[in-house]
């Protein structure tokens, strides 16, 4: 199995997942939820469909992520003024507070892995991984 790309990607994913759960995933927070929080913070008023496209996640997954973040009272939905069928998403005061902490924890989490590479190796790794998941039709 040592020659299989999928095997190595899975092991790398598990190592990153475990570290996230131990050091960032306070209260059961998952990486996808961090991604949603960050996306809403950078794009206040974004819709669930737009988040789904931006993060390349299916709509059912986004609904579950949004539901959990709403229950934590970290985000809120507001009906759009121009289209009452559309709901816009915003961070709450509590969500902004937690995201600030999470970003610090997330940077430390990332640094634990990034520090294993020099800048050239890191950039090359990112480029190679992008080749795996982009244009995968």
Residue map of PLM features:
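The alpha-helix within a helix-turn-helix
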Residues: 52
